[in-house]
Amino acid sequence: PLTFASLILGKDIQKISGEAALTDKGVDAQNSITLKYKSGKMAFLSSCMTAWMPNTGVICGSLGYIVAHDFWKCQRFTVCVRGREPYDVSCSFEISGYEYEVRAAIKAINEKRLYCDEMTWDESVRLMGVMDTLRNMWGIKYPFE
């Protein structure tokens, strides 16, 4: 969910808040996260390992919303515009859905770079920082920390 929010709303998070229910081993079995951006936009995220969830990403705007089905491996969007019938947009995988990652890795290797422009180290570290903030809020500490 964090990467999905970042792809849609960007990097300028102003405030991070959230709640989590931990297992007896200290794992966040379910959580709810709110990200408030400097632009005033907000992202509402959740994940859960104890319940079956629809795994949709929903992008809402003043004229309607878009549903990304199985957002982490999306092959279909449903576009819902106020006052109109919803319609689907397909974006099928060529093979497995990882083709774009393989192409980006090959391009970086051919250019003798250590990372891909599509997902830089800075972005990976930034998202890890958001996760660190949430884990600290929830009192999660791993044995190696």
Residue ranges and their predicted role:
Residues 1-2, 98-102, 124-127:
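A structural signal for well-ordered alpha-helical scaffolds and beta->alpha junctions
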Residues 2-75, 92, 103-111:
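Contiguous beta-strand/loop segments that form the cofactor/metal-binding neighborhood of enzyme cores
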Residues 26-27, 53, 99, 118, ...:
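Loop/helix-junction capping segments adjacent to catalytic residues or to phosphate/diphosphate-binding pockets
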Residues 38, 104-145:
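C-terminal helix-rich "cap/oligomerization" subdomain common to oxidoreductases
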Residues 39, 82-83:
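Solvent-exposed strand-loop boundary residues in beta-sheet-rich modules
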Residues 84-88:
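Surface-exposed loop/edge segments in extracytoplasmic proteins
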